[in-house]
């Protein structure tokens, strides 16, 4: 098993409903360690840059508007197969299709406001982590 790092966002809808602690508990209960975190209110430019790969898609404007509608939590998680483990904890992108007990099933209202984001691969995780965190901000958990 490989120790990996993945990137996670708790989106504005879940932050507004005070689900941060409950979601962090899910990460830690699943064996993922939080090695960096911070609260941000994305600017339009930051959101457009982060989601640039979707810029030609019809939902891009709504996504940027949603992601700038309130504070978010960004965090780096570390653990065995962290990318897959995190995505399993999140559940399906559409909360209506997410398995009971997953973050999206429990905390999300719709596919547009689905509580959280998780990297889909180790490579995208590295890119997404670097977008929000410097190397100095990552704190290895040695104990």
From Swiss-Prot:
Where the protein is mainly located, per its record?
Answer: cytoplasm
Its catalytic activity? a 2'-deoxyribonucleoside 5'-diphosphate + ATP = a 2'-deoxyribonucleoside 5'-triphosphate + ADP; a ribonucleoside 5'-diphosphate + ATP = a ribonucleoside 5'-triphosphate + ADP
Any Gene Ontology biological process: GTP biosynthetic process
EC number, UniProt record: 2.7.4.6
Q: Which positions bind ATP?
A: 11, 59, 87, 93, 104, 114
Which Pfam family name is an example for this entry?
NDK
For whether the record's keyword set contains Transmembrane, the answer is no
Gene3D superfamilies to which the protein is assigned, alphabetical: Nucleoside diphosphate kinase-like domain
Q: Name one GO molecular function term.
A: ATP binding
Q: Which UniProt keywords apply?
A: ATP-binding, Cytoplasm, Kinase, Magnesium, Metal-binding, Nucleotide metabolism, Nucleotide-binding, Phosphoprotein, Transferase
GO cellular component annotations, sorted alphabetically? Answer: cytoplasm
Q: Where is the active site?
A: 117 (pros-phosphohistidine intermediate)
Localization recorded for this chain is: Cytoplasm
Matches recorded under PROSITE patterns: NDPK, NDPK_LIKE
In terms of CDD domains, this protein maps to:
NDPk_I
State its cofactor. Answer: Mg(2+)
The text of the family note is: Belongs to the NDK family.
So what does this one do? Major role in the synthesis of nucleoside triphosphates other than ATP. The ATP gamma phosphate is transferred to the NDP beta phosphate via a ping-pong mechanism, using a phosphorylated active-site intermediate.
Q: How does it assemble?
A: Homotetramer.
Protein name, as recorded = Nucleoside diphosphate kinase
Q: What is the lineage of its organism?
A: Bacteria, Pseudomonadati, Pseudomonadota, Gammaproteobacteria, Alteromonadales
Originating gene: ndk
